[in-house]
């Protein structure tokens, strides 16, 4: 498989064969299935797409009377979109553009294609098309290194890491962490191409700093017994953004999910190693999310200090702050929304974390207000706004404060996913919009002059977004007082005109009731 994969890269035909999925058991005990279908653990809607890229499993399913996915065998033309043979009409959704951003293009069709490549499964296709071999194996027992452009994603086999002489300090992403001979493999290294990929060298944008010392070794690390530890399981290396901020940390998770697509494996029987060159720990308020990606605790790189460690299969994951990456500071064409990629990500995470939809409720719209107990961006007349909402009998209103010490992240997700209108001030908590149902609306009560952040995230996810528009009807407590920047709209609190607030919420409700996926078709005049 290794040689096929590498030669496939050379031919620009990256194998999509489920490299990490368990092989079918063709000699199973009578009365038992030929494959462990329960290990797939994907939402029902994703199964045809999985089988499209794992035809060996589809073939077994066709022969197996106990396969639960037979109904999907007639849908094997369905594809995510990054596969070379994928026809547009069978893709997992396609973005919609309501107008043409003339700064980018001049037709709706080309606008949709641009957005699909920027932020949908077209983004994964571009990474696959960039793949090239940097270290070529000669035999099946050799090592290999295959990377996308700028070393934003890499895949290595029989990787050797020598951490016996490592010196750690406060720097989480030390650039000269490895010296020559301390990271590498037994393969023919294209050193010129490797060193030419450093244009985006930066801690959370590229793996260049970590792999620039990759060395062509004169020994086979595993075969020649040069390893103190051999890691048999596939391992994902990740450099993580801030684990205390949902917006930044979910840049980690979405890029891990895209990496799984590029790698064509959604197995949770994998290790995840946090690449951190410091001796510090890592504060993670959203650690439950890892259960969607691995069966094991996340491993800190320092766990392997003072040892030579060899990884049979290693993946260097796409990173959270890549230039033109997703979704931190991503320049997006205007007028387009609804990516299949972000919808699939939300479905994937919710399914694996067992977060279910308990509604919607006939005759009710579930409204959730996200309160803030922080010093800034509080809603000063919150009670007044809530009382106004409660005058509408259709609204079922709840106020939540997503404080991790009082409400676990899984409970937060259950509330969010069972919300039809989600209201909150500008802040990382609005990242919850990723997990709203498709028909929902998010109301960023006030964006504090940061106009694109959650508007763009809502566009990516495909949920309706509104925010406050009339400046004469929002009342800041003062001009704001940033500790170093002086006056700043994010560093104060706000009151809002009740009538204008209700007008905007009713607009959001109107969207919910008219959404194609809203199951109740009653007239909304009662609002």
Swiss-Prot record:
Predominant localisation class: endoplasmic reticulum
Cystine connections: none
Keyword line: Disease variant, Endoplasmic reticulum, Glycoprotein, Glycosyltransferase, Signal, Transferase
UniProt family annotation: Belongs to the glycosyltransferase 61 family.
Disease / disorder: Adams-Oliver syndrome 4: A form of Adams-Oliver syndrome, a disorder characterized by the congenital absence of skin (aplasia cutis congenita) in combination with transverse limb defects. Aplasia cutis congenita can be located anywhere on the body, but in the vast majority of the cases, it is present on the posterior parietal region where it is often associated with an underlying defect of the parietal bones. Limb abnormalities are typically limb truncation defects affecting the distal phalanges or entire digits (true ectrodactyly).
Function: Catalyzes the transfer of a single N-acetylglucosamine from UDP-GlcNAc to a serine or threonine residue in extracellular proteins resulting in their modification with a beta-linked N-acetylglucosamine (O-GlcNAc). Specifically glycosylates the Thr residue located between the fifth and sixth conserved cysteines of folded EGF-like domains.
PANTHER family per record: EGF DOMAIN-SPECIFIC O-LINKED N-ACETYLGLUCOSAMINE TRANSFERASE (PTHR20961:SF148), GLYCOSYLTRANSFERASE (PTHR20961)
The protein's name in its UniProt record: EGF domain-specific O-linked N-acetylglucosamine transferase
Lineage summary: Eukaryota, Metazoa, Chordata, Craniata, Vertebrata
Gene transcribed to yield this protein: EOGT
